[in-house]
Structure formats: structure tokens, C-alpha cells
Amino acid sequence: MKLTLMRDNGGTTTMRTLDINIQIETMKHETKAQPDSNLRTSIRYASPDSKLDDVKKLAKVVPAATFRKIVNGIQMTGYNGIIQIEVNHLANRMEVNRVKQEAAELSHTFAAFMGSGGHSVKIWIRFTRPDKSLPQKREEAEIFQANAYRKAVSLYPVSYTHLRAHETKA
């Protein structure tokens, strides 16, 4: 399975396709530049209305699909059925770890990890059709993604009071 990393480099969007397992391993170990740690420090000292430059330095992970640039924009080249839901506004690292552990114990969880801001957990769940296939066309993938997203929210405990489903566009 593959995913796409997108980064805005001063008005130009760059895209990179990676194996999903390699990306998960990469997220476990921060790079030398420490973009996540720098962002978490900035958040701690920022006022509510401030814009954080450290956010711009982070790549956007698009777990549901792979894309490529075309003349008129971007084109989906593959779809893997990954849905991301988020548990936001967690108080501290202990609460983040508790939610990660609870999510990891559920059989349908593909991956669960702390968000870059340090106060959320991202949970990835993989969905397929009953015959284990996935949509190939973008329009079909978008409908499938929307339905799978609603199902994903219902699979997780009500105790996640801050649960907000995050629909990743296919």
C-alpha cells in the first residue's frame, strides 16, 4: 500500500509517493531538523490568534490515495481504503498515550499515532468492499471514502469525547 506526502514550497506543491509502512516507520523517528518538536514548542508559547511558521514545514500525509501532478492539477493514481479519524484536544501526553493504546487494541485499527501538535491522536482504519476489492476511479473512491468514514466513526468508543472524523479526500 502506498500514500502521498504533499508539501507546499512557497506556492509550488511537491508530491511524493511512499510505501505506507515506510512512512509509519519514518514517523516513529523524528528527523534531525525536528519539525514536530519545534511545532509543539511553538504551540506551547503561541497566542491563540498567531500563525505558526513551523506548520508550513510539515508535509501533509494523504493516507487514502496516491496522486500525481497533471497540467490542470492533480490526478489520483491509486486508492488504498485508509480512513483517518482524529481524537483532538487531548490534555497531555498521558491522555494521548491512553487513546493510542485503546485504539491499538481494536482489531480494525491499522495504525494510531500522536498528531504533530502533541494533543491529538490520528487513527487509520483500512476498509475494503466485501470481496476485498477497492474502487479504482476517483469518483467511486470518493463515495466509498465518505461511506467508510461514517462507518469508521461508529467503530470507536463513545468515550472518545473529542472524536472528530476527518475525511481524507480520495
Kindly give the residue locations of the regions a language model identified:
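DNA replication initiation on ssDNA origins
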Residues: 1-81
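Short, surface-exposed ligand-recognition loops at beta-strand->loop->(often short) alpha-helix junctions
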Residues: 86-95
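Helical (often loop-to-helix) elements that flank the catalytic cores of nucleotide-handling enzymes
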Residues: 99-102, 127-160
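Conserved small/polar residues in nucleotide/adenosyl-binding loops
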Residues: 161-170
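Short connector loops at helix/strand junctions that flank enzyme active sites
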Residues: 78-80, 107, 118
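Histidine-centered divalent-metal-coordination microenvironment in nucleic-acid enzymes
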Residues: 85, 110-137
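Conserved alpha/beta core surface patches that mediate binding of polyanionic ligands
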Residues: 100-110
